[in-house]
Amino acid sequence: MAKAATPKTTAAAEAKPAAKAPAKKAAPKTTAAAKPAATKSGAPKAAAAGAIGHITQVIGAVVDVKFPEGQLPLILNALEVDNQGHRLVLEVAQHLGEDTVRTIAMDATEGLVRGQEARDTGEPIMVPVGVETLGRIMNVIGEPVDEAGPIKTKATRAIHQNAPEYIEQSTEAEILVTGIKVVDLLAPYAKGGKIGLFGGAGVGKTVLIMELINNVAKAHGGYSVFAGVGERTREGNDLYHEMIESGVNKLGGGEGSKAALVYGQMNEPPGARARVALSGLTVAENFRDQGQDVLFFVDNIFRFTQAGSEVSALLGRIPSAVGYQPTLATDMGAMQERITTTTKGSITSVQAIYVPADDLTDPAPATSFAHLDATTVLSRSIAEKGIYPAVDPLDSTSRMLDPKVVGEEHYAVARQVQSILQRYKALQDIIAILGMDELSEEDKLTVARARKIERFLSQPFFVAEVFTGSPGKLVDLADTIKGFKGLCAGDYDHLPEAAFYMVGSIEEALEKAKKLAAEAA
């Protein structure tokens, strides 16, 4: 084929391959200027940057590239192709035979032709890192997509990194207060931990993540990184403008901005969606290694798995359960293990996790469970009652709900709330068949309290003010505990259920009860 054109391309021709490459150059000495390590006589010939290959096959997002003998790029290296004036990055995924690599494209492959040149960069995909990324949106390969000019950073970093060593990791237990009652009371988040928001389609995962960005990122003062993985472009756009309006970011980035955004949305090819979480994580890791406490938001981790499964089939791997890739647990582990707190700084990660068909046993959400410190499960049955956030108080868990961490009072109130709600759940079948009248007096009281607790777990959000018309509320942890303690003890048995719906603290519920009484009079 076109192999004769550049039989032994030198790495000196890295930026612009010369048309007349020396025909008889010795291949073993081919090295990149940036990689002197490869000059050692025992080093693999494959480590040569600047090697030129030619495309032999394009199947959707998967592209095969043939290289001259002895110049095979390493696995995970980035190759660059000029696709009609547009820089297309391919990531090496497999070695086929002695001279061909199978790669995953990070953008659309329309316009590629067989025989086209592909240049080995000699390193993995590199993204810009540092304070210059704050207030900006970039894509999976670190290119700006917010039309605010290039991102001029002092450093770049490879998106594939090893997880921190055991000796570097920190294990202190501290709570991250969110101002959301149901979360802070029943499944509190760990500072420097991993939090998963589980839910089916349309139960409020993205709204909850936006509220957390609003409450925590503003109060937190440190830097935040948001990775939009395979979700709606409209929501990504809304978030960008909302951050500017609320003062978290400045238009066009620069001083005063607190959050970096990395997007690879629904319309992107699977290669971009499978790697954009790593690009975002790389930006967050850089802040952590500089001693910052970083918040890392991912919406949606399921799309990372989904993209991996799309690519896996194209790479010719035999699928495992439910059609997922056989490397599901490995892919997830490689990413999740990097999200950790070290002795230098911390990463607190909040991840929205879509649950296909509301089935928590599906391999994708089930694999994510193992990595999390706290899980917030959003339930459709609660959303149907109009209770938002639709957090399931019995399904949501946290390792922080421990008297040694949260204190005896908080722990006792949380467990009491759960036991009342559990009893109500057990009685629901009896109520449905026989009605309330058949219950004992004690059970009637439990049901009445449970219904009030259920409504008091709802809360108006700042980010949903536009839809609900009611101003958002941020509730202090002490007020949350006080309110639920009183509800469990029966201090508010005389108030109507409606008084507890969509309010912040218990004082607001008392005010609302007075209003309702005045209206009824």
UniProtKB/Swiss-Prot annotation:
Where is the protein localized?
A: Cell inner membrane
- The record's region (Disordered) falls at 1-42
- EC class of the enzyme, as a word: translocase
Which reaction equation describes what this protein catalyses?
ATP + H2O + 4 H(+)(in) = ADP + phosphate + 5 H(+)(out)
**What Gene Ontology cellular-component terms does the record carry?**
plasma membrane; proton-transporting ATP synthase complex
One GO molecular function term? ATP hydrolysis activity
Please tell me where ATP binds in this chain: G199, G200, A201, G202, V203, G204, K205, T206
Primary localisation category: membrane
What is the membrane topology here?
Answer: Peripheral membrane protein
Claim: Kinase is one of the keywords in the record = no
Q: Name one Pfam family in it.
A: ATP-synt_VA_C
EC number assigned by the record:
7.1.2.2
Q: Where along the chain is composition biased (Low complexity)?
A: 1-21, 28-42
The entry's keywords? ATP synthesis, ATP-binding, Cell inner membrane, Cell membrane, CF(1), Hydrogen ion transport, Ion transport, Membrane, Nucleotide-binding, Translocase, Transport
For this chain, the family text in UniProt reads: Belongs to the ATPase alpha/beta chains family.
Q: Which PANTHER family match?
A: ATP SYNTHASE, ATP SYNTHASE SUBUNIT BETA, MITOCHONDRIAL
Name the job this protein performs.
Produces ATP from ADP in the presence of a proton gradient across the membrane. The catalytic sites are hosted primarily by the beta subunits.
Q: How does it assemble?
A: F-type ATPases have 2 components, CF(1) - the catalytic core - and CF(0) - the membrane proton channel. CF(1) has five subunits: alpha(3), beta(3), gamma(1), delta(1), epsilon(1). CF(0) has three main subunits: a(1), b(2) and c(9-12). The alpha and beta chains form an alternating ring which encloses part of the gamma chain. CF(1) is attached to CF(0) by a central stalk formed by the gamma and epsilon chains, while a peripheral stalk is formed by the delta and b chains.
Q: Under what name is this protein listed?
A: ATP synthase subunit beta
Origin organism of this chain? Brucella canis (strain ATCC 23365 / NCTC 10854 / RM-666)
